[in-house]
Structure formats: C-alpha cells, structure tokens
C-alpha cells in the first residue's frame, strides 16, 4: 500500500507548480490551467486523507470542488472568448483597463 506521505508530497509539488504558473505566467490560458492544477492538487490530498482515515467526506468534498471548478472554467472560457474577440490578445498585461 502506498504511504500517505507520498500523496502529500505529490499534492504539494503539484500545488507549487500551479502556484508558480499563476504567479509567473502572463498568458491567461496558462494561468487558468495552472489554477486547475492548484485545485486538483488539493483534491488529491482530500481523497488521500479520506482514504487513509476511512472517511468519505474527503471524496465528497473533492466532488464538490470538481463541480465548482467546472462552472468556473465555463465562465472563464466565456470571458476568454470575449476577450480574444475584442482585444485579440491572451496576455494578462494587455487587459488592465475596465470600462463600465
């Protein structure tokens, strides 16, 4: 059986990679994918802790996170399509002004 600390290390590594992608990259699509990596690393830890402590709440919470993430991706991709149509860019730096 795989020890719990392997899953914790995997989750931490994926979280650090995702956080670095969110903080360092300038492409909105890459930032969105890095955010998904962050959330999936948290899901790995929820499921691992739920399995090792014989509690199903970690799995249920991971399913809720996946559902909320799907809604977030749908909204973000809609905004991304509108942004590309209006500004013809995917760079975060080019989208700094908001008009009301």
Curated annotation (Swiss-Prot):
Q: Name its cellular compartments.
A: Cell inner membrane
Which reactions fall under this protein's catalytic activity?
a quinone + NADH + 5 H(+)(in) = a quinol + NAD(+) + 4 H(+)(out)
Give GO cellular component annotations, separated by semicolons.
NADH dehydrogenase complex; plasma membrane
The record's listing under Pfam families reads: Oxidored_q2
Single GO BP term: ATP synthesis coupled electron transport
User: So which residues are the signal peptide here?
Assistant: none
Chain segments annotated as transmembrane? 4-24, 28-48, 60-80
Q: Does the keyword Cell membrane apply?
A: yes
* Topology class, membrane: Multi-pass membrane protein
Please indicate if the UniProt record lists rRNA-binding as a keyword. no
GO MF annotations, alphabetized: NADH:ubiquinone reductase (non-electrogenic) activity; quinone binding
Q: What is its main location?
A: membrane
Q: What is its EC number?
A: 7.1.1.-
Question: What keywords is this UniProt entry annotated with?
Answer: Cell inner membrane, Cell membrane, Membrane, NAD, Quinone, Translocase, Transmembrane, Transmembrane helix, Transport, Ubiquinone
Which domain of life does this protein belong to? Bacteria
Entry similarity comment: Belongs to the complex I subunit 4L family.
Q: What does this protein do?
A: NDH-1 shuttles electrons from NADH, via FMN and iron-sulfur (Fe-S) centers, to quinones in the respiratory chain. The immediate electron acceptor for the enzyme in this species is believed to be ubiquinone. Couples the redox reaction to proton translocation (for every two electrons transferred, four hydrogen ions are translocated across the cytoplasmic membrane), and thus conserves the redox energy in a proton gradient.
Q: How does it assemble?
A: NDH-1 is composed of 14 different subunits. Subunits NuoA, H, J, K, L, M, N constitute the membrane sector of the complex.
Q: What is this protein called in UniProt?
A: NADH-quinone oxidoreductase subunit K 2
